[in-house]
Swiss-Prot record:
Its EC number is 2.1.1.13. It is an enzyme of class 2 (transferase). Residues 364-625 form the Pterin-binding domain. The gene is mtr. GO terms for biological process: homocysteine metabolic process; methionine biosynthetic process; methylation; tetrahydrofolate metabolic process. Keywords: Amino-acid biosynthesis, Cobalamin, Cobalt, Metal-binding, Methionine biosynthesis, Methyltransferase, Repeat, S-adenosyl-L-methionine, Transferase, Zinc. Pathway: Amino-acid biosynthesis; L-methionine biosynthesis via de novo pathway; L-methionine from L-homocysteine (MetH route): step 1/1. This is Methionine synthase. L-homocysteine is bound via the zinc atom. The keyword Zinc applies. It comes from Dictyostelium discoideum. Residues 766-883 form the B12-binding domain.
Length: 1260
């Protein structure tokens, strides 16, 4: 609270408030990047005290407060000198969870005390220098390396790697030590999980129960990306709502984003926050190398705009910022008034992943009642049977039906309610479509309530407490609820029992209100009264007025305590008529009509099952209103008569596919949008029989439906797999119509008395020719683009893979193409694209050129391709952009403007590119060699493989490969990308936007995989080889496998390239040759080679799907073959490490660790960053007779056939790592060409993507 007069407050509160009323205050910048500038080694971290500590300590920055305190104090002083008002202690990881990584949990107290003392002494020094500008120490409480809201296990969404109580204990230890060390402020920062933060705030409150005076508490959350959410999925506003009741002095955002990206989220926080607001962004987003590029001047300009817009009270810097940044911030904000705290109308606000604000527009808030073991037999049975995932469907249905809050009740004699509610809440936490709404924890057992409070990151509701337990226990329970930050339902009960009359209801509620607001400190808007909805029409006269008593009590409560809310369990009203759901629902609807008018704000209802008041039959409405309002003496009797005459124990719930009853055009559109092929033939036939011609069916309902698909895809409401399924439906329909169209054409020709083919083709938006260029066999992306364009009424002519330029030219002419698109995956394709562009220019074509594929980029298109073709040349990032680009290129009104915009943009890119080449610095090849990877080969004895020569495997187990699949690239192929916290497999399934479609796609993939394995539709095979080897500089000399002892017969050389980008540090300039013992060392080393493919049989699969007009299955097969090829490479490499080379015999890694390369050795591939020259593949093919042994072919352009193939080189060196050669100079190109005995021009052609200078393409 900003203007708190709490007598327990420290003097710091008043001082900081006064300064904040006058100016924007400044926090320090990054600690980690400043520490990095000292280039500390492991011994520096150890110091004298820990020199013999048995675990590695490098990177434990918090430990430096003990071992290198002068460095930490120096950094503090630099920030203070730059103008910081607040400096943070060096304790971001000063908790038992993070220190456990270093086996240093026992040092947590010391680290925090000493860190606080270091910062305090620095602040005191600078305050003494200028007493008019006091400096303050913020005790940094980091997020820990655990998350209480996210499961660490794919298979067990309810699992957690830390629990609330464990977090509280860990945070309490840290807070106690920081305060002992002398901090002025507690800063809970970089919060990525609100439940972790709530645990920290709970611990802080526990601490201040016994310690005085209180210190100010700041909280700073982290929005992880442009989706505007924390890692655990909450929006910034929802996070603020979760912690707002903790009497924070400051709430803000830090880390993950640069200032520009953070601005919209900061603005939202600034609007809703009733405390001071802070922000300390990163120095921009991380660059390619993980660094930060925004200069102090750049950031200061953005910070100044924040301040001028009234968004800031405190500003600082996070990752990548320095004392220079802080100095620039101080100068930028000087003289700008601080943000004014907004005066907001007090309102009840709750949160799940998203906030729920009780505005007037909401009218009435539905609390879903079906997750109640007492009220739903189905839910109870699922919980008892331990079927929690199925039970989630009950909650999901409630949300989908309109519930804005979910009530959860586990009170049942045969259920362990504490365990059940925690487990179910953890399951819900992994389901964003459910956890987006707030939770109501419903139990008569307070232990169950508190157990639930420890599992929910949002601001929830406790249902309920009451005075029936006595005033002392009521207050105790209320204080606990408040400490967890929840709102509370208070029942109209007291020591004498349940209130039934209006007067008793109002009296008990008012008494409860006074206690909660005056003795416990509850805000009125966090109090929800339940004045007891009791059962009417029971046959007992005294019950007849219960409805009226509730309605009138509600009216008075709202007049007496207007900021509070009124709720109730609506189904209690009709309990007498259990089993007659239509009657009960009519009673509920009519009751709410009057109760809402009296001021009832919310109620526990079966969301989605309430009829509209005006839709209730008039005769029934009169009966239920007579009973509810107690208008006649015989109301109960008449209602009972009606119930007996109209007894319907169950609603007729026949699942009818209603869309099948719609007109045929709507059925076709529905089938296209939903991807349903079941009825498309019969619907198409029906349309053909009702429309003038078969062509009319295509141009009418089919294209109409596809237009809807195109619009939905363009608006982001459909995703790529759905679009491809739509195309499958379309193709099946068209295939059915083609014979009829041919017959109609024949009859027309007969009518005209000639045999000339009629040209009544369906209208289209334009003709697009697509081709994978010569030498390249990869076409998944191109095929997807073709489908998407086809769905948007473009006629697509796909001329396949490995397409020579002349064939592309012929297709353009023959089909009168409006646009041509070139695709390629491998680096040599880039030169082929340049050649095609040059030929199109020479032949004076006037159509636009689109460039796409994994190896292409906007900068390459602008610099290398566009200058060779005078017509519009556009790089298309993925299929989702293709439609917009083609539309823009062909739009008669705007195509010239679009082309000019692209041309201007590409000209600017070229200018920047050439300017950057001038600015980059490269070291000479000789100097780079002198600074190669240093290895003491005298101490290393390389492991000899178990055999030398080659080994062929003709049929690798597909079952084993399925278990090794990395699914993340699979979803990238289909252009499905989740947002935090749901990026990557399997969390993508939880993503609000793409999760459902990703799961469907994954299920389809599993079905096809099973068929592939069961029927052996694909064959996985390959060859591996091991050879004696030594290195000379960058190159690896390979000897005959029968010449291991003398090594006198070199049989081949693998040529390498060395990094030349000048480095600011003493890091080595790496080449692959560094990982093999040099010839001069005398050490016998070895190298491995491999080539594998899982693509044998793929052509047959694709051909079958093409005949069935099934693009979806065709693309799926290719995507799975690619995944299986990568899995094969991973599996064989594992076999090599454990058996064939056997340098890690006992290794047993999880898939996750495999994909993260947590093993010794690497397997780089020619054509990739460590050796970008594809022609090195020829050496692999020659040495191992790959073509003869496996039938994997190599094209002239170094593409492998089948395309689902992987090849590379095995290194066993323990320090070998993947790296990127980066740009190289002409000097190295000349050396490389000379060693390899090729021309300089040929070397430049194959290495064009990494040249540090420009060169002309080869003329063909």
């Amino acid at each position: 609270m900003i203007n708190s007069n709490d007598k327990n407050e420290s003097d710091t509160f008043g001082i900081i408030r006064k300064i904040l009323s006058e100016r924007i205050m400044v926090l320090d910048g990054a600690m980690g990047t400043e520490i990095q500038k000292f280039k500390l080694k492991d011994n520096d971290y150890r110091g004298e005290e820990f020199k013999d500590f048995p675990h590695e300590l490098g990177g434990n920055n918090d430990l430096l407060s003990l071992t290198q305190p002068h460095i930490i104090r120096e950094i503090h002083c630099k920030y203070l000198e730059a103008g910081a008002d607040f400096i943070e202690t060096n304790t971001f990881n000063g908790n038992i969870f993070s220190q456990a990584d270093y086996k240093m949990e026992h040092l947590v107290k010391r680290i925090n005390i000493e860190s606080a003392r270091l910062a305090k002494s620095a602040c005191e020094e600078y305050t003494k220098k200028d007493p008019s500008r006091p400096r303050f120490v913020c005790g940094a409480v980091g997020p820990t390396n655990k998350t209480a809201s996210i499961s660490p296990s794919v298979e067990r969404p309810e699992a957690r790697n830390v629990l609330f109580d464990e977090l509280v204990s860990g945070y309490l230890e840290q807070v106690e030590a920081l305060v002992e060390g002398g901090i002025d402020v507690i800063l809970v920062e970089t919060v990525f999980d609100s439940l972790n933060c709530k645990a920290a705030l709970f611990a802080i409150e526990e601490f201040f129960k016994t310690y005085s005076p209180r210190l100010p508490v700041f909280v700073s959350g982290t929005i992880v990306d442009k989706s505007g959410r924390t890692l655990s999925g909450q929006t910034g506003e929802a996070f603020y709502t979760s912690v707002a009741s903790a009497n924070l002095m400051v709430f803000g955002l830090n880390c993950a984003l640069g200032a520009q990206e953070m601005r919209p989220f900061l603005q939202n926080i600034s609007k809703c926050s009733e405390c001071y607001v802070s922000c300390y962004p990163n120095a921009g987003l991380p660059n390619t190398f993980g660094g930060y590029d925004e200069t102090p001047e750049m950031m200061a300009e953005q910070i100044k705009e924040f301040a001028e817009s009234g968004l800031l009270n405190i500003v600082g810097g996070c990752c990548g910022t320095s004392p220079d940044h802080i100095r620039a911030f101080c100068n930028a904000i000087e003289g700008i008034a601080p943000r004014a705290i907004p005066t907001l109308v007090p309102n009840t606000t709750l949160s799940g992943l998203e906030p729920l604000v009780f505005t007037k527009e909401l009218n009435f808030v539905n609390v879903g009642e079906r997750c109640n073991v007492s009220g739903s037999r189905r839910f109870a049975n699922l919980i008892k049977a331990n079927k929690y995932e199925e039970a989630l469907s009950v909650a999901r249905q409630q949300v989908e039906a309109g519930a804005q809050i979910i009530d959860i009740n586990m009170d049942e004699g045969m259920i362990d309610a504490v365990a059940a509610i925690q487990k179910f809440l953890f399951f819900i936490g992994s389901e964003p479509e459910i956890s987006k709404v707030p939770i109501m924890l419903d139990s008569s057992n307070f232990d169950v309530v508190e157990a639930g409070l420890k599992c929910v990151q949002g601001k929830c509701i406790v249902n309920s407490i009451s005075l029936k337990v006595g005033e002392e226990l009521f207050i105790k329970q209320a204080k606990i609820v408040k400490q967890y930050g929840a709102s509370v339902v208070v029942m109209a009960f007291d020591e004498n029992g349940q209130a039934t009359s209006k007067e008793e209801k109002v009296r008990i509620c008012y008494r409860s209100y006074k206690i909660l607001t005056e003795q416990v400190g509850f805000y009125p808007q966090d109090i929800i009264f339940d004045p007891n909805i009791l059962t009417i029409a029971t046959g007992l006269e005294e019950h007849n007025n219960y409805g009226v008593e509730f309605i009138e009590a509600t009216r008075e409560i709202k007049a007496l305590m207007p900021l509070t809310r009124v709720s109730g369990g609506v189904s209690n009203l009709s309990f007498s008529f259990r089993g007659n759901e239509p009657l009960r629902e009519a009673m509920h609807s009519a009751f709410l009509y009057y109760a809402i008018a009296a001021g009832m704000d919310m109620g526990i209802v079966n969301a989605g099952a309430l009829p509209i008041y005006d839709d209730i039959p008039k005769d029934l409405l009169k009966l239920v209103e007579d009973a509810i309002l107690n208008r006649t003496n015989d109301a109960t009797e008449k209602l009972l008569e009606y119930a007996q005459a109209n007894n319907k124990s169950e609603k007729a719930n026949v699942e009818v596919e209603e869309w099948r009853n719609k007109p045929v055009s709507e059925r076709i559109a529905h089938a296209l949008v939903k991807g349903i092929t079941t009825y498309i033939i019969e619907d198409t036939e029906e349309a053909r029989n009702t429309l003038p011609s078969s062509l009319s069916v295509i141009e009418g309902p089919l294209m109409g439906g596809m237009n809807v698909v195109g619009d939905l895809f363009g608006a982001g409401k459909m995703f790529l797999p759905q679009v491809i399924k739509s195309a499958r439906v379309m193709k099946k329909a068209v295939a059915h119509l083609i014979p009829f169209m041919e017959e109609e054409k024949r009859l027309k020709r007969l009518e005209k008395g000639n045999d000339e083919a009629a040209e009544d083709e369906p209208d289209n938006a334009g003709v697009v020719v697509l081709a994978t260029v010569k030498g390249d066999v990869h076409d998944i992306g191109k095929n997807i683009v073709g489908v998407v364009l086809g769905c948007n009424n473009y006629k697509v002519i796909d001329i396949g893979v490995m397409t020579p330029c002349e064939k592309i030219v012929e297709a353009i002419i023959a089909n009168k193409a409006d646009v041509v698109g070139l695709s390629g995956l491998i680096t040599p394709s880039l030169d082929e694209m340049i050649y095609v562009a040059s030929e199109l220019e020479r032949l004076k074509f006037k159509i636009p050129l689109m460039i796409g594929g994994a190896t292409t980029s906007q900068i390459h298109t602008a610099v290398k391709i566009s200058p060779h073709y005078s017509q519009p040349t556009v790089h298309v990032l993925d299929a989702s952009r293709s439609v917009t680009v083609v539309q823009s290129l062909l739009d008669p009104n705007n195509k010239e403007v679009f082309a000019e915009d692209v041309s201007q943009q590409y000209a600017e890119l070229r200018e920047k590119h050439y300017a950057s080449l001038k600015d980059r610095k490269y070291t000479s090849l000789e100097k780079a060699r002198q600074h190669c990877v240093k290895v003491n080969w005298k101490t290393i004895q390389p492991v000899k493989p178990t055999f030398l020569g080659t080994q062929v495997f003709k049929e690798y187990s597909l079952e084993k490969l399925v278990t090794k699949i990395d699914w993340n690239p699979f979803f990238v192929t289909w252009q499905l990308r989740g947002k935090y916290p749901n990026r990557g497999y399997p969390r993508i399934f939880n993503d609000e936007t793409v999760g459902a479609e990703a799961k469907k796609l994954f299920d389809d993939a599993q079905t096809m995989l099973k068929e592939i394995v069961d029927k052996k539709l694909l064959n996985a095979r390959g060859v591996i080889g091991f050879y004696p080897a030594n290195s000379i500089d960058e190159d690896i000399i390979i000897y005959d496998h029968n010449d291991d002892e003398t090594r006198s017969k070199p049989i081949a050389t693998l040529f390498g390239l060395r990094q030349q980008n000048e480095k600011e540090t003493d890091e080595p300039y790496i080449a692959i040759g560094d990982y093999i013992a040099p010839v001069s060392s005398g050490v016998k080393d070895y190298i491995g080679l491999f080539a594998v493919s899982s693509g044998f049989g793929l052509e047959d699969m694709v051909e079958k799907y093409k005949k069935e007009n099934d693009d979806y299955s065709s693309i799926m097969a290719k995507a799975l073959a690619d995944r299986l090829a990568e899995a094969l490479a991973e599996a064989v490499h594992e076999d090599v490490r454990r058996e064939h080379w056997a340098y890690e015999k006992d290794q047993a890694l999880s898939n996750e660790d495999l994909f993260k390369i947590k093993y010794k050795g690497i397997r780089p591939a020619p054509g990739y960053p460590a050796q970008p020259d594809h022609t090195e593949m020829k050496t692999i093919w020659s040495l191992m007779n790959v073509n003869e042994n496996t039938s994997i072919e190599l094209t002239d352009h170094m593409a492998m056939l089948p395309g689902a193939a992987v090849c590379g080189v095995y290194f066993s060196h323990e320090h070998a790592k993947y790296f990127s050669v980066g740009k190289i100079t002409k000097e190295q190109i000349e050396s490389y060409a000379s060693r390899k005995q090729i021309t300089k021009e040929e070397a430049e052609r194959w290495l064009s993507s990494i040249l540090s200078y420009d060169r002309l393409p080869l003329v063909k």
